[in-house]
Structures are given as structure tokens and as C-alpha cells.
């Protein structure tokens, strides 16, 4: 379960965000063309018995730390539409409505190189929709014209000239999401060579060498977001690896890996599965270390109504937690940093969420309440059951269960109220104007 740690105000509307693969750094792209890099707060490293740092940092929840601005710049003329770190985090790629793709040093923000995004049909600008660093050798870039460009990062001259190594058209509409498929056991590089994209009302799979492999049937509903989830429990004809896709009507559809012609399962997230459900604009898989809190594999979806929902996609499927990012603005981006913190972005704010942890005092209070509840049941329960040894005995058990459930609800409500005093404030921010 997550609790809100802090809220980061932005200078203009958020269009995109990305998280560093090895450091607690968040980069955001804004509607005004600015790109900001923030260092998220971490707890002072605890010392072990020998006085050495154990290296395990976590977010400070005392309200005394700050989110530091690493750097900020006006990177694009027009809005910054998409961002992505390289695999090692050394380079931050950005692309904007000025049809420029730029590579910058992530530590300083200084531009290393830039190219103009080509438009194969006309000389007009072809703004990007998303980018993804597939490997140290390959950068993927999708555009408004439905093109998917592959840039070979090993060929410096090719990258500087702006000419992509390959261009594919997997959809008849712009590409709304891209999810790499894990490398096979036979892979020697360890990097993905296939990926799933959504665009319009179809899903497609593209291979680095062979191009577009397959395109799904028309789903008759807009496909907006996607993520690959492995390690699911095998059940009947369903396998252990799926791609989860967020639709425009509040439904998450599951797609069996290798069976790409049509969806296999549907999970209703909003609106009862009918037209009018909120759009599922962004999606990310919950890290393995947090799955225990939810009893199985889960994804987090950012919704058009400003809510953030945790959806279990393995076992008993459905929404298991509902968070609120904003009352109006859609959540256009969700992600997890290296510390397992959930980062949601939408409107002019970014929110940081951490796993809810009970402190020692709360645990002791709950244990004492459980003991008192148990003593009350022992004292009052035996006489009641002796008098009612008939068919009404089942009703007594049901009433007892209801009382216990009510006690739990009261304790949970009390706990939420206490933590709410910590997690809802806006921390100080260095470098913000």
C-alpha cells in the first residue's frame, strides 16, 4: 500500500517524465519546452555495527529534506513531448514539437548532439510521440506520421545526419505506447530485440532485424498504454507472460505472449467496462519487492480523472488500491525509481509515493487492541453460544465476524489519519524559482 510522501510543483504542464536507471533522479519534460532534472530525497544511510554505510537508502518522511534541482533548461521550442535515459543513465534523450531529437549528458544537461526528425512524406515537421533507448546500440523514436524510426547509435555519422537505420509503420495511427519484450534465453547480448507497440485500435510486434512481425485485429477501442509482465501463475490455457494494455474506456486487456491476434482477458478498472470509463493513459509494472503487499503481480495505471490505481493482473484480478494524484488533470506518466517509490505525474505536479510502513508504536497499539478484542470474545462469547445452540448459531458467528471487521476498519481509519499528517505536505525545493 502506498502513501503520498510529497508533491513537486512544476512551472508548466507536464508532458513526459522518465527515471534514471541507477540513481534517484527524475527528469520531466514540460509544455513550455523546458526539461528539468531533480534529485529525489533519500534517507541518510544507516551505519552497520562496524560503522560502515549499508548502502540502502529510502525516502525521508520527516518533511525536512528537499528535492534538489540538478539542472533546468529550455530544451525545445514548443513542448517537450518525450524523454528517455540511456541504459546506463549517462545520456538523456529528448524530443519536442520542434521536430528535434537531442542527446544531453544527464549529469549536466549539456547537449552532446542533435538531429532533425525526418518526415518521409513531406518537408513539414514531424513531431515525436515517444522514444525508447532499446540498447546501447539502438534508439527507437515514434512520430505523429505513424513512423517508427530506428537509430543505430554505433554509427556516429548516421546519427548526426539524422538518417535512421530503419523506418517501420506498424500502425495506421500514431504510436501511443512501446513495451520491450525480454530477450530470449538464446540471446548473447542480453538486450531486447523485439517490442510491442499500440497505436489507434491495434497492437503490433516489431523485430529489430525482421521489421513488423504481426498486427492484431481491430479492437474497436483506443489502446493507450502498455507494459510487459512476466512470472504470472500458469492457469489452464493461459501462460506466464503477458502484455497488459490500457484502453480508452477504463479496461486493461491482457495479451498472451506469442498470441498477438487478439486479447485473451479483460480487467475492468473504471466505468463498469462500458463506454464512458476513464482512459488509462499510463502504465507501469509494480516491482517484485512490492508484490507481497498486493498478493500477486500488479500494474499501476494513471487515469484520465487524476486517479492512480493498482491493478492485480495475476490470481484474483481487479483494482486493489485507488490513489488520488489530482482532482481534474489526467495522470500522463507513472514510474518507479530505484528505491521502489512510485512517481506519478500530471497537470502541473509530480507526486512521490512510498510503501506504507507501520511504526513501532502503531504496531504495539494494534497488538494490544487485538488482545483486548480476543479477551472480550472469550469472556462474553461462551455464555451467548451456550444459550443459542440452535439454527441461529450461524447468525451469531456472522455477527461476531462483522464486529471484528468493524474493529479492523476503525483501526485502519485511525492509522490513515495519523499518517496523513506526514505525507500530504509540499517539501522544500532547491533551485525552484
UniProtKB/Swiss-Prot annotation:
The keyword Ligase does not apply. Belongs to the WD repeat WDR55 family. Residues 420-433 have a biased composition (Gly residues). GO terms for cellular component: nucleolus. Residues 385-400 have a biased composition (Basic and acidic residues). It comes from Sclerotinia sclerotiorum (strain ATCC 18683 / 1980 / Ss-1) (White mold). Residues 408-419 have a biased composition (Basic residues). InterPro entries: WD40/YVTN_repeat-like_dom_sf, WD40_repeat_dom_sf, WDR55_POC1. Residues 355-433 are annotated as: Disordered. Residues 357-378 have a biased composition (Acidic residues). Its main location: nucleus. This is WD repeat-containing protein jip5. It is found in: Nucleus, Nucleolus. Keywords: Nucleus, Repeat, WD repeat. WD repeats lie at residues 9-48, 75-116, 120-161, 218-265, 275-321, 326-363.
